[in-house]
């Protein structure tokens, strides 16, 4: 969150359902938590409508940021007449932060096995947030649905007269609400179109004109990928500068990990989907599976570091539960001999040869933040 805008990132797990669908509410809401990236920053006061969201004509397949199978509305409608509270079989979905100013989101996406769903639909998604810049990555996008295309939506906004392709060589895509997108990896489609949709309560036909852009993964994709950058309300000089010199570097993007270095903040952020043992990392020897790590230099020998496992670690998988979240221990190996600048109850360090074993006890899906120095 900065100034007068906010971004909301949404996933779901075995403990947190992806959407609340009822008999006469949110009938087409299946994709709300498939990695959505909602920007709200326009309107007086700032509102959803002011930021480009209106229901009339809205394509429920295209929530910004989500990776989805683009279905006809009769198939997207919940197969259950009453309540649908779909949860994932995966537990790695959530966010972390560093110094309360910058953050990241990561998820293992896996669709449920319901009628008109595609149960082998999987993907690994991440969003890295630095100041007014977001880096969005996707890997392993796969499913067997050969009837309908799989897409990752950049934006869908009520058309306000501003064209989606802007800049020299159409380098930037513009959502019409002062947010700009550049796709590094992916086949992009952009359109301004009159759309026909359905009302989420009554299923009545609705219509509206929207500006949209998305990345095509095709039908029944195998190991699809994407990479794009988002600038939120940038200045003209921001657009010019970042076109010439990107502010970030992707250090790894595969099924094991998504790793991004941001040049302006100096932050390196890791979404480790599987056990990660980087060969040439400056700091880490090993990060365990399903862990988010962020760090930045604070001094010549010191770093600010955060570690997070978003899993609530709740054993009881019922509709609701009184069971509290349980601690999870993460063991991270660092190069060299590190010490904490101040003791912490939930952090332990042990020197092993020329490495340091950092043991962090995570709880409630919250990041544990610390200062460390290298001797």
Where are these regions (language model features)?
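Extended polysaccharide-engagement surfaces of secreted carbohydrate-active enzymes
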Residues: 1-341, 350-354, 362-374
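C-terminal His-loop and adjacent cap/lid subdomain of alpha/beta-hydrolase
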Residues: 345
